[in-house]
Structure formats: C-alpha cells, structure tokens
C-alpha cells in the first residue's frame, strides 16, 4: 500500500506583520504583544523598511510587563513570510510611505509616537523610559482590542 502524504485539515493561523522603519522599537513591541496576547490563534511578525538593531530600552519596557523580546532581531520586509501574512500594519509614517504594494494582503496604518525621538533629550534612561512605557501601553491596547477585529473584517 502506497504511503499517503499527510494533509493538514487545520487551516493555518492568520498572520499579522508590523512594519516600521528600523524594526527596532515599535514594530518589535507590537510583535511581542501579539505573540503574548494572541499566540493561540494568530502568528506575529515584524520587519523594517531599513532595519537597524533592536532597541535596548524597548526590550526593557517590554520586560517590565513580562514580555521577552530580547531574542528578536531586526529584519527587512523582504524576510517576512508573506504567504503567512494576512494583515500588514504600518506603525510609523515613514514605513507607511515606503510600504510596498502587497497583492492580496490587507494593509492598514496605525501610527505610534517614536520613543527614541521622544526620549532624545532625556537626562537618563529612567527619564527616557517614561516615553517607552507610554508607547508600549498604547501598542498593547491596539494589539489587544483592534487587531482581532481587523483580521475579521
């Protein structure tokens, strides 16, 4: 008897990718929140139009609320598994302007303030963290409340 190829009867989980310029802060936080809040029923990804390095204060801000993004790396949009992405969310204006047209994918823009820019004149990391925490919490609210609705419709 010939062996049959295994065919999954389960559709893949929907995927959401967050895009910003450097893939260092906001998009990384959003990916971390999605994986933390919705990993049972969604896949999370992030990328940048001009990737740099992971922002250490973004890592710290997420760690404060029990979300570990320390193993994340900055990636280019070309590295996204587009066959697994259903919704692409740009989280900064530059990424929105540079976002390529992706046939068959829903693309929305939800901008968030840039913590490194806001914290540029901070006198210490502790002072800078005030900006990172605010943006972190705004991203959490968006990911928790809006992303499931956006995927449905």
Predicted regions and their residues:
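Conserved active-site segments centered on acidic
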Residues: 2-79
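Residues at the C-termini of beta-strands that transition into short coil/loop
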Residues: 48, 92, 111-113
């Amino acid at each position: 008897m010939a062996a049959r190829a295994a065919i999954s009867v389960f559709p893949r989980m929907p995927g959401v990718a967050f895009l910003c310029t450097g893939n260092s802060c906001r998009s990384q936080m959003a990916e971390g929140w999605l994986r933390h809040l919705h990993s049972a029923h969604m896949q999370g990804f992030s990328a940048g139009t001009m990737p740099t390095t992971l922002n250490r204060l973004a890592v710290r801000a997420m760690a404060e609320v029990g979300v570990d993004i320390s193993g994340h790396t900055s990636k280019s949009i070309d590295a996204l598994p587009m066959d697994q992405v259903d919704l692409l969310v740009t989280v900064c204006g530059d990424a929105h302007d540079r976002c390529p047209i992706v046939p068959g994918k829903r693309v929305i823009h939800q901008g968030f303030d840039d913590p490194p820019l806001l914290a540029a004149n901070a006198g210490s990391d502790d002072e800078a963290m005030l900006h990172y925490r605010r943006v972190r919490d705004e991203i959490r609210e968006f990911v928790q409340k809006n992303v499931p609705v956006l995927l449905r419709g």
